[in-house]
């Protein structure tokens, strides 16, 4: 599940103030899984928010990216990147309208008591019932169609954006984003075994 393209959230042309090695850094959000990345940018380039960059495996196509440093969390973003993220996510969602409209048409229950739609902000039992009834009559065709057919329903793009941000901050369920990377738990015996096996490899 690797990202191919991403949009710039923030750019530090002089790098991080506290970094030992100062190099131009960009914070990027993937267009497919909304993965948050920290990347080193090639020298003498200028970037701005919402610039689209190739971040896939083909190194020859990476015209502006020197290398991907790491996947980062929402909390690790700069204040500037956090201020841009909502509008950038909206832009991505609008560009993938068919996929997200199909989510409303195809999503199903998580359990006996809960439906995927109820994970969206401001979607309670009444809205859930209304959406299911409407899509049974006719599949939704666009964001505009959803808004027009659902009385008192907020802008679906805003609702989806809020859900993506919630997942990026950390959530029990992940509908649209990649779950956080699992880091090894160094507790008791597991910690000792990890370092013992690592020592053998050396």
Residue ranges and their predicted role:
Residues 42, 115-118:
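A structural connector/turn signal
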Residues 91-116, 133-202:
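C-terminal extensions
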Residues 124-125:
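Small-residue hinge/turn detector
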Residues 128-131:
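Conserved hydrophobic/aromatic packing and binding residues within compact polymer-binding modules
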């Amino acid at each position: 599940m690797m990202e191919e393209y991403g949009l710039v959230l923030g750019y530090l042309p002089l790098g991080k103030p506290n970094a030992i090695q100062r190099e131009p850094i960009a914070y990027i959000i993937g267009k497919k899984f909304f993965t948050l990345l920290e990347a080193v940018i090639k020298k003498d380039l200028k970037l701005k928010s919402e610039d689209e960059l190739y971040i896939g495996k083909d190194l020859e196509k990476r015209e502006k990216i020197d290398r991907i440093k790491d996947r980062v969390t929402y909390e690790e973003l700069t204040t500037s990147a956090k201020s841009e993220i909502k509008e950038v996510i909206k832009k991505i969602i609008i560009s993938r309208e068919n996929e997200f409209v199909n989510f409303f048409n195809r999503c199903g229950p998580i359990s006996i008591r809960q439906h995927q739609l109820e994970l969206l902000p401001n979607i309670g039992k009444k809205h859930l019932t209304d959406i299911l009834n409407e899509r049974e009559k006719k599949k939704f065709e666009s964001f505009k169609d959803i808004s027009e057919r659902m009385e008192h329903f907020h802008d679906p793009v805003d609702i989806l954006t809020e859900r993506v941000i919630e997942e990026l901050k950390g959530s029990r369920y992940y509908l649209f984003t990649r779950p956080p990377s699992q880091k090894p738990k160094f507790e008791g015996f597991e910690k000792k075994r990890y370092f013992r096996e690592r020592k053998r490899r050396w």
